[in-house]
Amino acid sequence: MNDAVRLCIPALPLGDALIELGRQSGLEISFPPAAVAGKVSPVVRGRFPARLALDQMLEGSGLALRAEGANRYLIYVDQPDPTHASRLDPVRVYGEQLGERVYSRQEIATTPSSNRDLSTLVATHPAVRTNPGAHGAQNRGSLDIEDISFYGASPYQNLFQIDGIDATNRVDPANKNLAQVGGNVPSNPQSYFIDASLLEAVHVHDSFVPVEYGRFNGGVVDARLRRFAGENHLKFDYRWNTSNMTRQRVSPGQENKWTQGEPGFTPRWQKRFYSVVADIAVNDKAGMVLAMSHRQSRIARWGLSADDAGKSLRTPNNYRDRIDNFLGKFSVRPDADTLVDLTLKYSDRSEALTSNTARDTQYANNHGAYGLAARLEHRLPAARLTLQAGWDHAMSNRRSTSREWVTTRPYRLPVYFKGGFGREQKQQDTVLLKGRIDLDPLRARAFTHNVYAGIDAQRIDAAFKRPKLSTAYTRTYGSTGGYTDSNRYLWRPGTVRARSQTAALYLSDRVEWRRLALDAGLRYDHESLFGSHSVAPRTRLDWDVLGSGATVLSGGWSRYFGGAVLETALEARRLRLLQQLTDFRGNPVPAGKQDFAVDYSGLRMPYDDEWAFSLRQRMAGLEGLLGYVRRDGRRQWIKSGKINTGFTYRNGGNSTTDAVSLTLRTLEPWRAGPTRWHLQVSWSWQKRKTNTDLAKGYDDNARGPNDRVIYNGAPIRTIDLPPRSFHQPQLAALTLTGAYPRAGLTWTHTLNWRGRRDDIIYVGRGPGPSFLDRYQSGGLPSYWTWDTRLSWQPPPVMPRLELTIDILNLLNRMPAIVAGNPTLASNNATYQSGRELWLQVGYRF
């Protein structure tokens, strides 16, 4: 049966799911009850050939199928051990919708990786761009998570979810400043730093994004937790890497910072990762999956102190960077029509730092979250109802033991700094309720309607907290030993809050007529803090050219409204906790001159308009997809002003991105003798114009249409200046995974290619009378890297033992990836990280 059919099958016991598939598709499926006992089928929802849906249901089950005639199949137990990691099962690609990419558990397990975070996993996606320095050698020992941008949209306007529950930081995600500054708390767009090896799958939506997703401009990254599969299992993994197993190249201009381990640089480290995953049966209707991991890196840094004579002295020590995860999902199926999931999530990252420029100054930057969620799926007579509820607490804080920051000016000796600002924290508490109903297909004459509707309500309570008073001042010594204090500031204790409530309604109908299908959706959002109302259409027209699902032309227009950044509302209230007592001469400063103002009146939600077109072709066991996407970003948030005159936020940012992509992948494994092979190839090209800097996010001011700069010696419009961040014109990736089940081997090769690009370097002001900003291009060549992973489970000896080796950048290519500034005396370019070796051992009970 090659004709595509519309299927809506929830996660069910495998036997029930196969019966339901036969009922909806007309297939005759036979299977022994013992073979499917204790196994659960994934959700199958969408329009595709029923035979392909059957493959999706059997993925990872240890079962295979054999054709017994027209539309008749027999399910039987496959001979290779289904728990064997090297067994290469079919890739789950058939159920993917246009604009969606699913990273399955099997793909995650076979992908060469370093820190196993979500950003690294999706970095080779054709729609995704990272900042150029993300692959650099200068900070390879860190466990920090890189930001990602979809189609030139803000990296701080993506939607991150865990099992459909929002896991996005809405407070101050763009702050990357690691320095000790009062009121400064670095953060990240992802509330949870999830270990990808603990997940069942990661769903990425980059275009044609369905109407149920809102509050984003860029893309959607939805991490799915594992659900109990019917059998008791326990798996341990230990993984390690050190700086001695990693080649690094650092430019002369950065060598001093790198050698001393200044924050943002890591010269020497030892990484140790531990993880445990347990599948536990409660009874024949209930079970749970508990997944835990501890990732740590011990980093050598040099701290500044003083000897007995008061002379500066640098001493080395080790500082820990760690991430802890705990993920739990309890699932119960009281009957064939009902499924209930209860989920617990916990993530905590702590990075201990020391200053190499301030004496006796140690501090820690922390980023963590924990939450609870519940999900109910219930089959009604003519529909399926899904209800979700969630609560999450997320925070970022900076802690130092000292609450006094002193700038000391000794008599005829160098100035030095010392101290800290105690504890300062930004946080958000999120309560979310969601409901959705999917109606069974409705047939009216020649048309078939597939309708679903839903509600999405969310409340975010954001806060900035400073528990205790901190002070900052300058102490200047005279020739007699006396001193005077000036520039005294009080960072007063307190808590400031802001609340944002959003409510959304959405409706979608897929209307099918002959070989045409129209997806028409509409989403309405209301946000309370900024008083924003938005209506977002989502449309897509599909033409099944041959009527078999093999050749599909698609095109559509959609609008994606972003979410609020609550730092804009917290900023003025936070600044009012700061009080200046004396000026730089030591004279008192009247309180009336310290009215900090932030104006965000009239601010509306930013949005991206998307025009997307694609051609999908399936033949000979392969699927190819050619796509074009145009994104017009409008009403992006910008910031202007100074602290002494007040800040103003406005909707002044605009961007335009054109993107072309081509992907090719196998639908089923290629078989060569006893081996099986999967292939995934992608290439993408992007061109972007913008009047803001993506890396600065909502803190950047916009450049006007008539503003001009000097670029390579010639004046041009500022809008024509090439992008400086999150820009890589061409990317390509090839992943080939092979398995030899009899020998217990799995071998993955990934080739990554980055095309040449021009880096943009600021080189100062031009001549008068205009004094325009001057920029110069720095040409960076194209280059390849080769990553590989080899896993071995010795079947005759210890089939449950797994040994893995990852080698990243096998050929040790280390070109410049960020150009150096030609005006500096020494080269300060950033280079690609070199060959990197990871070793891993795992055991499954």
Show the residue positions of the predicted features.
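Gram-negative outer-membrane beta-barrel transporters
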Residues: 512-517, 625-763, 842-844
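Face-selective signature of the C-terminal outer-membrane beta-barrel domain
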Residues: 329-349, 367-530, 659-684
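N-terminal periplasmic accessory domains that precede
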Residues: 73-78, 148, 185-193, 204, ...
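N-terminal export/assembly leaders
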Residues: 1-82
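Structural signature of Gram-negative outer-membrane beta-barrels, strongest in the C-terminal barrel
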Residues: 428-430, 446-450, 456-458, 494-621, ...
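C-terminal beta-signal and adjacent terminal beta-strands/loops
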Residues: 752-767, 785, 792-845
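Transmembrane beta-barrel wall of Gram-negative outer-membrane proteins
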Residues: 232-235, 264-350, 367-380, 384, ...
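Periplasmic N-terminal accessory/gating domains of Gram-negative outer-membrane beta-barrel systems
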Residues: 58-59, 94-210, 217-220, 224, ...
